[in-house]
Amino acid sequence: MRYVIAVKSPIYGKQGAFLAYQFAESLIKKEHEISQIFFFQDGVSNGNALVYPANDEVNLQKHWQMFSITYNVPLHLCVAASQRRGVVDNLTTPTTAHYNLAEGFTIAGLGEFIAASLNADRVITL
């Protein structure tokens, strides 16, 4: 089956983002396909390069990055939610010298999410 995973939970402080990561790992192990992971609302904090976990905490951002590289799954952040929460890339910031989008993440519009959702068998939101 083909899945799209939508993550609305912040990177830390709640369990939703970590559960989404665990679910994505399980899907791949069961040989399902994930066409994209879309972060929206507070979930865009998963793509903020300025988030530094404590040494004894899981580095969830690093896990997402490795997941994306290993399984070729794009990590998309909602452009509107990102801008409202101060997560910008070199194209969406007014000053191109300052951006904080983490490596491996892409800022995208709802159109990309909807297109992927239309081609998916399941859309899961966490």
UniProtKB/Swiss-Prot annotation:
<dbReference type="InterPro" id="IPR027396">
    <property type="entry name" value="DsrEFH-like"/>
</dbReference>
<protein>
    <recommendedName>
        <fullName>Sulfurtransferase TusD homolog</fullName>
        <ecNumber>2.8.1.-</ecNumber>
    </recommendedName>
</protein>
<comment type="similarity">
    <text>Belongs to the DsrE/TusD family.</text>
</comment>
<dbReference type="GO" id="GO:1990228">
    <property type="term" value="C:sulfurtransferase complex"/>
</dbReference>
<keyword id="KW-0963">Cytoplasm</keyword>
<dbReference type="InterPro" id="IPR003787">
    <property type="entry name" value="Sulphur_relay_DsrE/F-like"/>
</dbReference>
<keyword id="KW-0808">Transferase</keyword>
<feature type="active site" description="Cysteine persulfide intermediate">
    <location>
        <position position="78"/>
    </location>
</feature>
<dbReference type="GO" id="GO:0002143">
    <property type="term" value="P:tRNA wobble position uridine thiolation"/>
</dbReference>
<comment type="function">
    <text>Could be part of a sulfur-relay system.</text>
</comment>
<dbReference type="GO" id="GO:0097163">
    <property type="term" value="F:sulfur carrier activity"/>
</dbReference>
<dbReference type="Pfam" id="PF02635">
    <property type="entry name" value="DsrE"/>
</dbReference>
<dbReference type="InterPro" id="IPR017463">
    <property type="entry name" value="Sulphur_relay_TusD/DsrE"/>
</dbReference>
<dbReference type="GO" id="GO:0016783">
    <property type="term" value="F:sulfurtransferase activity"/>
</dbReference>
<dbReference type="GO" id="GO:0005829">
    <property type="term" value="C:cytosol"/>
</dbReference>
